[in-house]
Swiss-Prot record:
Belongs to the class-I aminoacyl-tRNA synthetase family. ValS type 2 subfamily. ValRS has two distinct active sites: one for aminoacylation and one for editing. The misactivated threonine is translocated from the active site to the editing site. This is Valine--tRNA ligase. Its main location: cytoplasm. Coiled coil: none annotated. A motif ('HIGH' region) lies at residues 52-62. Pfam families: Anticodon_1, tRNA-synt_1. Monomer. It comes from Anaplasma marginale (strain St. Maries). SUPFAM superfamilies: Anticodon-binding domain of a subclass of class I aminoacyl-tRNA synthetases, Nucleotidylyl transferase, ValRS/IleRS/LeuRS editing domain. Keywords: Aminoacyl-tRNA synthetase, ATP-binding, Cytoplasm, Ligase, Nucleotide-binding, Protein biosynthesis.
Length: 823
């Protein structure tokens, strides 16, 4: 494809100006649609790209992982694949709502639903534009014609079709049962949205008594839940309490009576060994409640306040009614104060313990009884673990994280959220006599629907109750492979795009293995009966200088725009590529500076090499000089190494090998060894061989660097060679000469050069200072004559002497020319 960057048509500027180059390249790429998917399904390489959440500005941590995917996309494109590389924006759900609330300095509950969702759409549009501009500056090679966003009508149609398909297959259900509740955002959440935080608290030892009057002590961190106590438990192996089996205890706050029961989940060595079960303090309470068929006493509201307290009995040591309406945090202290006043607070020990909190708001989780929609998980854990084994994980160690997550799951996936801006459930509930509560669904051809606005076929407004909840944002983004194919199981079909499933690659960071990766595997298994992608590539975190995860909420995130202004996109991409796949990396300006030095060196080396040939017209002649065959042998191995590693998504290893070849083999040594022949100071044959090799090696080097440094390589290639570099074929190692013997001789030659350089450095003389004699002994004494001639010119040596091999090691002696006295 004959695409050139106009600014550099004639020659390379004296300095690399990254801002000018980036603008020119983007304009040319857009004009010629370099990254457009051509529609060749059979030759496609399909990437399931993570849609960034519209929850605030992107930072260097996002840049880090999105660059990793682009390295692979660019390689696959050059390797002959028709790359299907979309970008989406996840702009529905709680993260976007929280952003709007922060920007507008209000809460969603203060506005009418329609007004707030309109505000959300406006803000998400603004941030999608910002995201788009940043990705373009980074040189991410998306096909922008494939762009989607999750609150669009098209994606809502697919998401609601997913719901209908799962409902038809009995893979989801609606039920009242215990759920995790965020009291700040006032919504149900899933286990994947929970983080564990170490918080300061107190372990309170509190006196209960049996109906018979025996004093018994329990230990708890949540005394405010005592009015919700429904049983006391002890371990059946604990001899201290076995006599209590079947007795009743009187709860001090409120005075109601509860059974004392054995259960082996109680730890004998924790607290007093006697535990109260409340509905609900934690997931163990839920287990006991279900297993022992206990009563339900729900006293925590959706906003985290104490409510619905039962009437106090005459046995109450402390009236519960006084705590009604208090927030749980305030009630915790108030209950302890009351217990202490009544002589029932035995002890209070300060502790730091792990508390499950909502990932977004940071609020400690409450467990409430509520009607919600759930996707079945528990009964299919074995099949899901089998699906995990079918995917190729890069690195493979990340597979274990998914396995552990699935093995430890105890609940089905709650997908309903009590929020406003999201994909609505396509559900109404009948109010007709004889079918009250019946679930009513639309025809798939009518999607998307909004139950608050639309009606099911054959029903009037007064005959239905719309489902007012919205879906978990993961319930939508988990069908990202289906976004690409416009198909969901058998419900929605697109025969032209269906062959793109399963996709070739999912790229994402490791913290969302438990959410995005897991939910996508779950949905694809239910919809399609197979894995969603052949490969999954997992990036690590970008860490701040204090080695904590870089994040907007922590205030330690670096601004990518200013970094791009200062260092340029290629330097930023270089920094991103220097971290091994799956490994965390600390943000480093030193690495950015190294990347900037690399782009400058590549620019300058290209200018130097270009002085020896006309663009795309190297001199005729066969590369035959031994030194030239040495560098081509090194190049052959670099190309083979990089091809193999990029096939395995090991971008870091590929860049490192290219960089090492460029700096050490090409710039530091080969250019110096070949300079005299390139300047035509030797034979015509030697000159032709040198210039042809320089031409071929530089061209191949640019191709090897292109996935990582797309701008500088485009500018150089578009000036010195023909066409757009990103539309060229990836180099083939088999087409580059390899000679093992000459590679060995060349490597030995470089060791000799290093000894000469050391001698000159030690003598504190110039690299151009003349050498009287280089004596070479050991095994490597059968150098081709022309190699020694190249060595002589490079080292400014008058004579090179080869001695008989009397050692298994290379031996080098350097005699510098005598210093000329100024007298």
């Amino acid at each position: 494809m004959n695409v050139r960057v106009r600014h550099f048509m004639q020659s390379l500027d004296s300095r690399y100006q990254h801002k000018t180059v980036e603008e020119e390249c983007n304009a040319a790429w857009d004009e010629h649609k370099i990254y457009k998917w051509k529609g060749n399904v059979a030759q496609s390489f399909v990437i399931d790209t993570p849609p960034p959440t519209v929850s605030g500005v992107l930072h260097m941590g996002h840049v880090f992982s999105y660059c990793h995917t682009d390295f692979i996309a660019r390689y696959q494109r050059m390797a002959g694949k028709d790359v299907f590389y979309p970008i989406g924006f996840d702009d529905n759900g709680l993260p976007t709502e929280r952003l709007v609330e922060k920007i507008k300095k209000l809460r969603a509950v203060q506005l009418e639903r329609a007004e707030f969702t309109k505000m959300c759409r406006e803000v998400s549009h603004e941030f999608r534009t910002k995201f788009r501009n940043l990705f373009r500056r980074l040189g991410i090679s998306y096909d922008w014609a494939l762009e989607y966003h999750t609150v669009s009508e098209e994606v809502q149609r697919l998401s609601q079709a997913s719901f209908l398909d799962l409902y038809a297959k009995d893979k989801l259900y609606r039920k009242q049962q215990p759920i995790l509740w965020d009291t700040v955002d006032c919504t149900a959440i899933a286990h994947a949205e929970v983080e564990e935080l170490d918080l300061h608290s107190h372990l309170n030892t509190i006196s209960f008594h049996t109906v018979g009057g025996e004093k018994i002590d329990i230990a708890t961190t949540r005394p405010e839940l005592i009015p919700a106590c429904v049983a006391l438990f002890f371990n059946p192996e604990d001899d201290r309490y076995t006599h209590l089996h079947g007795q009743f205890a009187v709860v001090p706050v409120g005075g109601h009576k509860v059974k004392i029961l054995p259960d082996d989940k109680v730890r004998i060595d924790k607290g007093t060994g006697l535990v109260m079960c409340c509905t609900f303090g934690d997931e163990t309470d839920v287990y006991w409640w279900r297993t022992h068929n206990l009563d339900t006493k729900t006293i925590v509201s959706r906003t985290g306040h104490i409510v619905d307290l039962a009437e106090d009995t005459p046995d109450a040591k402390i009236p519960a009614a006084q705590f009604d309406g208090m927030h749980v945090q305030k009630a915790r202290k108030a209950v302890c104060d009351a217990l202490e006043g009544a002589g029932l607070l035995v002890s209070q020990e300060p502790i730091v313990h792990t508390v499950k909190c909502a990932e977004r708001s940071g609020a400690p989780i409450e467990i409430l009884l509520s009607h919600q929609w759930f996707v079945r998980v528990m009964e299919h854990k074995h099949e899901l673990l089998e699906q995990v084994q079918k995917v190729q994980w890069h690195p493979d160690s990340m597979r274990k994280r998914m396995e552990i997550w699935i093995e430890n799951l105890n609940w089905d996936w709650c997908i309903s959220r009590q929020r406003y801006f999201g994909v609505p459930f396509p559900v109404w509930y009948s109010k007709r006599e004889g079918e009250v509560g019946k679930v009513l669904l639309p025809d798939v051809r009518d999607l998307p629907v909004d139950p608050l606005r639309d009606l099911p076929s054959g029903y009037g407004r007064d005959e239905v109750e719309p489902d007012v909840d919205v879906m978990d944002t993961w319930a939508t983004s988990s069908i990202s492979p289906q976004f690409l194919t416009k198909s969901v199981g058998q419900v929605l079909r697109n025969e032209n795009l269906e062959p793109l499933f399963p996709t070739d690659l999912r790229a994402q960071s490791h913290e969302i293995i438990r959410s995005w990766a897991f939910y996508t595997m779950l949905k694809s298994y239910y919809h399609n009966g197979e894995i969603p992608w052949q490969n999954i590539m997992i990036s690590g975190w970008c860490l701040a200088e204090d080695k904590t995860k870089m994040s907007k909420s922590k205030g330690n995130a670096m601004d990518p725009e200013s970094t791009l202004d200062l260092y340029g996109a290629d330097s930023v991409r270089y920094w991103a590529a220097k971290s091994r796949l799956g490994a965390d990396t600390v943000f480093s300006e030193e690495v950015l500076k190294t990347g900037r030095r690399l782009t400058t060196k590549l620019w300058n080396a290209s200018k130097f090499v270009a002085t020896f040939f006309l663009r795309d017209n190297p001199p005729a002649g066969t590369t035959a000089a031994p030194t030239d065959l040495w560098i081509l042998s090194k190049l052959h191995k670099a190309v083979a190494h990089n091809t193999e590693n990029l096939k395995l998504f090991e971008y870091c290893a590929a860049l490192n090998r290219t960089e090492e070849f460029f700096w050490k083999d090409f710039c530091d040594n080969y250019l110096e060894l070949v300079k005299h022949r390139a300047y035509n100071h030797g034979s015509a044959h030697g000159h032709a061989s040198a210039v042809s090799t320089l031409h071929h090696t530089l061209k191949t080097l640019l191709l090897l660097f292109a996935p990582f440094l797309p701008y500088v390589t485009e500018a150089v290639y578009g000036t010195l060679f023909s066409g757009c570099i990103h539309a060229q074929e990836w180099p083939n190692a088999d087409e580059i000469p390899y000679n093992a013997s000459l590679e060995q001789h060349g490597d030995a030659l470089i060791k000799i050069v290093e000894e000469v350089r050391k001698a000159k450095t030690h003598a504190q003389v110039s690299v151009k200072y003349p050498v009287e004699l280089i004596t070479i002994g050991g095994l490597a004494t059968d150098f081709p004559e022309s190699m020694l001639e190249d060595l002589k010119h490079m080292c400014c040596a008058e004579q090179i002497k080869l001695t008989a091999p009397d050692s298994t090691e290379l031996e080098v002696a350097v005699t510098l020319a005598p210093t000329v006295s100024s007298n």
